[in-house]
């Protein structure tokens, strides 16, 4: 299938699904046949999902310049990961905590590892908070994602033995099924594997930020997302803030 045809398919399909994402979330049975056909078509119209490892170099360079010109917290609680970290106003949400936020772009775990020295090691953290769901959303398997988390954490432990790590669960979004048929399921599988991994290590702590995003009927709260259906709006982060505060407080040195 030509790249032009593939691009046109996704442009039209995304337009439809984005316009109906909230209704789909609330009434998925109405769209069962349409979504099934869409997923079948995705097997024909295959997107190029290759990631250039240094695609966020300009963002990292901006961090380098900022770090060189400003006094940063010593031994901060370091937030790293993808766009959910970027958009999180951590300085406001956790005022009084020594926070450094080094999320960038829609970073995948291999990209975080690639820029490890810039976004993690140089900051000498007293605690690290990690969030990244990009790999699964980009079609990678739970095994790929878990292994990437393990690689990142292993490298961190070599430099910062026994420093606590808060590993955030992968959040559901309104457009998981638009990304692909297995994305929502693979996020849940990944979360279960991360729980097992965290339980095997004394310095690693799994934080469930998914449950507060669901209503009493088990449906995802549509009102907590930006219009893109993927990123949290300010209301959405108010559901994360108390969960993370409790997790950080439980691990901070007295």
Region spans (language model):
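A short helix->loop->beta-strand "cap" motif at the edges of active sites that frequently abuts
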Residues: 160-164
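Extracellular/periplasmic catalytic domains that process cell-envelope and extracellular macromolecules
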Residues: 70-73, 93, 121-122, 159, ...
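Charged helix-capping and loop-helix junction motifs
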Residues: 143-152, 183-191
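Oxyanion-hole/transition-state-stabilizing segment in secreted/luminal serine hydrolases
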Residues: 80, 85-93, 98-100, 110-147, ...
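Catalytic His-Asp segment of secreted/periplasmic serine-dependent ester chemistry enzymes
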Residues: 172-254
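N-terminal secretory targeting modules
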Residues: 1-76, 90, 95
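Mobile, glycine- and charge-enriched loop segments
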Residues: 49-110, 229-234, 238-239, 249-250
């Amino acid at each position: 299938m030509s790249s032009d045809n593939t691009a046109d398919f996704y442009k039209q399909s995304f337009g439809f699904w984005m316009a109906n994402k909230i209704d789909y979330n609330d009434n998925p049975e109405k769209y069962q046949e349409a979504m099934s056909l869409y997923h079948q078509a995705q097997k024909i119209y295959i997107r190029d999902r290759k990631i250039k490892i240094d695609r966020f170099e300009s963002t990292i360079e901006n961090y380098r310049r900022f770090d060189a010109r400003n006094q940063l917290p010593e031994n901060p609680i370091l937030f790293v990961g993808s766009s959910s970290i970027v958009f999180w106003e951590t300085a406001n949400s956790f005022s009084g905590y020594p926070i450094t936020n080094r999320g960038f772009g829609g970073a995948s775990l291999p990209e975080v590892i690639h820029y490890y020295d810039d976004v993690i090691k140089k900051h000498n953290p007293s605690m690290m908070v990690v969030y990244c769901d990009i790999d699964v959303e980009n079609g990678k398997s739970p095994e790929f994602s878990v292994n990437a988390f393990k690689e990142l954490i292993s490298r961190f432990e070599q430099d910062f033995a026994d420093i606590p790590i808060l590993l955030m669960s992968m959040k559901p979004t309104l457009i998981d099924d638009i990304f692909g048929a297995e994305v929502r399921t693979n996020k849940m599988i990944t979360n279960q594997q991360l729980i097992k991994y965290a339980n095997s290590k004394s310095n690693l702590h799994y934080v469930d930020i998914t449950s507060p995003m669901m209503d009493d009927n088990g449906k995802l709260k549509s009102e907590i997302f930006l219009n893109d259906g993927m990123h949290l709006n300010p209301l959405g982060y108010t559901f994360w803030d108390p969960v993370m505060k409790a997790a950080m407080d439980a691990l901070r040195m007295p």
